[in-house]
Regions:
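Active-site-proximal mixed secondary-structure blocks
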Residues: 23-202
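Positively charged n-region of N-terminal signal peptides that target proteins for export
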Residues: 1-4
Length: 202
């Protein structure tokens, strides 16, 4: 059951918002008239869980430097308690964003209506240039200084609780061994972050 909760996915949750606020978070209406806080736990109770069905953008850093990438693996559920909503994301050590995830305590995941955003973010590396600027995205920050993009449809802010640096010894069958065979970016690190803020565009 714990595994099911942790790796349950994001689609229905992200599609639904609630008016009441039960977890401490910034009111992004101070920064944008179109992003409104919603209650993640209440959305859990109304919708249950489903698998990831679309790509999302992961961003980490602070007000001086940050980077974002496309993610297709992950989930949302409860971790270390029934009332502690959490997000699970996977970042390979060869990715530029991995350096930010290792250094900074918080990150955001975002949903966009325009698929060209996650297509570009997944194709190019931040080592070679400012991807947000190339896409015309505007960086903003939560009250904790966590970066996100003003144009996002959904923004979820997380504080990392657990980072699991997988090795081949962690694999229990041949599926991950076969998948990672020849994968140059390396075996993904699994990050589990407590959700400390969630906003959606009205």
């Amino acid at each position: 059951m714990k595994k099911q909760l942790i790796f349950a996915a994001l689609a229905l949750l992200l599609a639904t918002g609630c008016n009441q606020q039960k977890i401490e978070q910034t009111n992004m209406n101070k920064e944008s008239n179109e992003l409104t806080a919603f209650d993640v736990q209440e959305a859990f109770e109304k919708n249950g869980f489903t698998w990831f069905t679309e790509n999302l953008i992961l961003c980490s850093g602070d007000t001086t430097r940050n980077n974002a990438m496309t993610i297709g693996w992950g989930g949302i559920g409860n971790y270390l308690g029934h009332n502690r909503p959490a997000v699970t994301v996977y970042v390979a050590p060869g990715r530029y964003t991995w350096e930010f995830m290792e250094k900074y305590p918080r990150f955001t995941i975002m949903q966009f209506d325009d698929p060209s955003i996650w297509q570009y973010m997944g194709k190019y590396s931040g080592r070679d240039g400012d991807k947000a600027a190339a896409l015309g995205l505007h960086v903003a920050y939560t009250e904790h200084g966590t970066p996100y993009y003003e144009e996002a449809k959904i923004v979820i802010e997380c504080e990392t609780m657990t980072a699991w640096h997988q090795t081949e010894q962690d694999f229990r069958n041949d599926t991950p061994k076969q998948w990672y065979d020849g994968f140059e970016p390396g075996i993904h690190t699994i990050y589990i972050g407590e959700i400390i803020g969630a906003w959606k565009r009205q």
